[in-house]
Amino acid sequence: MYFMAEDYATLGHYDKASALLHSLNEAYRKGGQAVNPVFEAYEDVYSKLSKCGTFSVERPNNNVSVPLLTHTGNRKNPEMMFIMANINGQEVKCTYDSGAGINVMTTKFAERIKATVIQTKNIQMLGMSYADSKGLVVVDSLKLGDLVYRNLPFFVVDMRTDNPLANKKLEELGYECVIGTQTMMPLDEICFDFDRMQLVIPASYTPTPTYAPNFYHSPQRLYHLSLTDGRSGRKIDAIVDTGASGTILTNRYYKKNENCFTGRMATDSLRTAGVGSVNVVKTIPVSWTFTLAGEQYTETNIPVIRSSEQNEEYDCRIGLPTLMAHRKFIINFKNMWMRFED
């Protein structure tokens, strides 16, 4: 029922999504079981969104192309990738983030567009750490080139941390809005053309190729696909994250493969700043190979997370340097496949 509710929400049918989640939550209560707080929170969110106008996408009959920008101007070490959008008449640099299950704007930007913040049950969001939403904003319009979203929801978050260096970096990045997977799913297909540095939204989707791996959309609204791990020889679960500055093997991967790291010490620390705080983890640097759709890929130096408080539900996060090493990266939502093109 949760996935049916999410399907309704993706299409903008928030009343139906809320009703389904209400039925699910009531069934838990009547059965004497604890209600999943995520289900309960989204029942409240969708109920309130149903009163804010219908979500819709207006698109032309032609391809839409939007320039892609990186923070460094270097595809090998991009740090962050952005697109320029227009939200309620205000130009803003946004992260176009396949690793974000929701759309997010800073409290500062919400004030800038004079948005009305709707209070909802608390939603915890996983960036580099957990942070609580300050509420919900529904924007009248978000424009990407000739593409227009209407009545699009954003969660409002104070991204500042208690670390001055992290705050300085966030200010440098100009981190004001995150456009997440909710905006991608209704488009049928998107193409990251890294050679031309453009996000292309084609007028018609590509027929399914013979070698493209399938992926699924998780309850956390992330895009998961299966890889063959060159170290263990087993299938592992990866997410594709266009908002991630690097590729990592998670603490879950480490725990499942500790025997592969016998005698290896966590010699490095990885310090990351994200939504609301700073996180420091111990890492082991490794060279790593994986196979996807019959093609083998090698990462010469990526971190394995030796310790973490985040309890990731995946083994690997594929970030920007890995993705941008290819000419193109296509995500097809019509038939749920991904493909690199070289």
Which residues does each PLM region occupy?
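Pepsin/retropepsin-fold aspartyl endopeptidases
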Residues: 1-342
